[in-house]
Swiss-Prot record:
It comes from Escherichia coli (strain K12). It comes from the Bacteria. Belongs to the RcsB family. One of its GO terms (molecular function) is DNA binding. Keywords: Activator, Capsule biogenesis/degradation, DNA-binding, Phosphoprotein, Transcription, Transcription regulation, Two-component regulatory system. It holds the Pfam family GerE. This is Transcriptional regulatory protein RcsB. The gene is rcsB.
């Protein structure tokens, strides 16, 4: 089996440590870089001979942002780099939008400890990886009767930040878009989800996440 050079990006040092220790148990995986923000990650990517990036979905960074914005930038400027997203966000609408970016895998931080090694093993075979926990979440989209959940990546990014507590004005600044654009994308997403106000939106975002009984 060919060796796989991996970069890890997460803004929590203890998470970086845990991932590295987990990957050290896989003899064909080499960790060649660890970064705590997207700016440091992007600045160092050209210097590293990496095959795979394991990155958090929500991570600080000034110029390059995080989430879908960061993933799209990396895929555009580093097309040969495979991407596995590691996230605490288990909202199916957002996970669906992330998968639409044609990444190689997505792993929930609260999922099974074996999911990340399985994702890398699948990647070695030229396959993508979606754990059962994520597949079950995506099934809730059709089973829950919440309307058309096919959010665009931009709509998904706005909802992710809104769910994290950011105001529309703050989201506009963070994503370098106008307040009018952010408001329009938020309204469009709400129409797709069939919710009429912010309270209903927050209730939806919390109601279609992973319940304890659903976990691996």
């Amino acid at each position: 089996m060919n060796n796989m050079n991996v970069i890890i990006a997460d803004d929590h040092p203890i998470v970086l440590f845990g991932i590295r220790k987990s990957l050290e148990q896989i003899e064909w995986v080499n960790v060649v870089g660890e970064f705590e923000d997207s700016t440091a990650l992007i600045n160092n990517l050209p210097k590293l001979d990496a095959h795979v990036l394991i990155t958090d979905l929500s991570m600080p960074g000034d110029k390059y942002g995080d989430g879908i914005t960061l993933i799209k930038y990396i895929k555009r400027h580093f097309p040969s780099l495979s991407i596995i997203v590691l996230t605490m966000n288990n909202n199916p609408a957002i996970l669906s939008a992330v998968l639409d970016l044609d990444i190689e895998g997505i792993v929930l931080k609260q999922g099974a400890p074996t999911d990340l090694p399985k994702a890398l093993a699948a990647l070695q075979k030229g396959k993508k990886f979606t754990p059962e926990s994520v597949s079950r979440l995506l099934e809730k989209i059709s089973a829950g009767g919440y309307g058309d959940k096919r959010l665009s990546p931009k709509e998904s990014e706005v909802l992710r930040l809104f769910a994290e507590g950011f105001l529309v004005t703050e989201i506009a600044k963070k994503l370098n878009r106008s307040i009018k654009t952010i408001s329009s994308q938020k309204k469009s997403a709400m129409m797709k989800l069939g919710v009429e106000n912010d309270i209903a939106l927050l209730n939806y975002l919390s109601s279609v996440t992973l319940s304890p009984a659903d976990k691996d």
